[in-house]
């Protein structure tokens, strides 16, 4: 690694094992998958681990050896948070409308199963995240080791499958999820203490969280949910990820790939 881009094994601890794990996963994912000769359009996802993805890419701007190439990267955000991450790290901002074909995308996950199927959307950006990740030739997941399921989705992540819906369809979709798809519990996601009422996405939709317990066939469940009138998108990301990096608190990283 050239001077100016810190070596992973020489990094000082952040003083928080969980943050160390996230940083290790993100830095290694960027270093091993970002190809300077081939990648120009980069998708930047949402969430706490992706903070370190944007940070790592931004570090290449500070190295004279990489500056010329890194300054030409165009980064596509999945929402307001990732837009700010891109700008805060002095990276060039683009949009999915301008660049509908993305070379590589990095994003986090709420849970990853043994087949690299994902639950995403805990941050309420699932439609934009899926739009960016499925537009990318390569999609890399970065997360800490808590997000790795031993087998099925729904084992570790117990908040349910996030589903983005048209606001006026809330009652209809909730009833269909309970009666047709036998969800154990369905809740409309509420805003925090500073905001009364439901969470509103960047696309002015609502988010439902539907608990199906452990999900042995996420592909089938995704198809069934998508057929319900009023559903915009599900937080089940099927056959999308190429590779997942899981950071451990000791700084080591596990890699899962297809």
UniProtKB/Swiss-Prot annotation:
One of its GO terms (biological process) is pentose-phosphate shunt. The keyword Phosphoprotein does not apply. InterPro entries: NagB/RpiA_transferase-like, Ribose5P_isomerase_type_A. It catalyses: aldehydo-D-ribose 5-phosphate = D-ribulose 5-phosphate. One of its GO terms (cellular component) is cytoplasm. GO terms for molecular function: ribose-5-phosphate isomerase activity. Keywords: Isomerase. The keyword Isomerase applies. Pathway: Carbohydrate degradation; pentose phosphate pathway; D-ribose 5-phosphate from D-ribulose 5-phosphate (non-oxidative stage): step 1/1. Its EC number is 5.3.1.6. Signal peptide: none annotated. Present with 5680 molecules/cell in log phase SD medium. Belongs to the ribose 5-phosphate isomerase family. This is Ribose-5-phosphate isomerase. It comes from Saccharomyces cerevisiae (strain ATCC 204508 / S288c).
């Amino acid at each position: 690694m050239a001077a100016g881009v810190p070596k992973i094994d020489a990094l000082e601890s952040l003083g928080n094992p969980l943050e160390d794990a996230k940083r290790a996963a993100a830095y290694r994912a960027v270093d091993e998958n970002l190809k300077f000769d081939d990648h120009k359009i980069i998708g930047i996802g949402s969430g706490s681990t992706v903070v370190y993805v944007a940070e790592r890419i931004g570090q290449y701007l500070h190295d004279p050896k990489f500056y010329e190439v890194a300054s030409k990267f165009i980064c596509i955000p999945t929402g307001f948070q990732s837009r700010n991450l891109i700008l805060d790290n002095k990276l060039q901002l683009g949009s999915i409308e301008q660049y509908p074909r993305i070379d590589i995308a990095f994003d986090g996950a709420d849970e990853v199963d043994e087949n690299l199927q994902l639950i995403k959307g805990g941050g309420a950006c699932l439609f934009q995240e899926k739009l960016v990740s499925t537009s990318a030739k390569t999609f890399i997941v970065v997360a800490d080791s808590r997000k790795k399921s031993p087998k099925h989705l729904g084992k570790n992540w117990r908040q349910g499958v996030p589903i983005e819906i048209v606001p006026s369809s809330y009652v209809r979709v909730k009833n269909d999820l309970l009666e047709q798809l036998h969800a154990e519990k369905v809740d409309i996601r509420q805003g925090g203490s500073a905001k009364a009422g439901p969470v509103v996405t960047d696309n002015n939709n609502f988010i439902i969280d539907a608990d199906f317990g452990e999900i042995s066939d996420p592909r089938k469940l995704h198809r069934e949910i998508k057929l319900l009138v009023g559903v915009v998108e599900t937080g089940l990301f099927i056959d999308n990820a190429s590779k997942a990096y899981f950071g451990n608190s000791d700084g080591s990283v596990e890699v899962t790939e297809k």
